[in-house]
């Protein structure tokens, strides 16, 4: 399960 959470985490780390 790494579709929305992965994008959210990447945007948050940006």
UniProtKB/Swiss-Prot annotation:
It comes from Euglena gracilis. It comes from the Eukaryota. Keywords: Hydrolase. It is an enzyme of class 3 (hydrolase). Belongs to the PPase family. Its EC number is 3.6.1.1. It catalyses: diphosphate + H2O = 2 phosphate + H(+). This is Inorganic pyrophosphatase. GO terms for molecular function: inorganic diphosphate phosphatase activity. Monomer.
């Amino acid at each position: 399960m790494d579709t929305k959470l992965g994008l959210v985490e990447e945007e948050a780390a940006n």
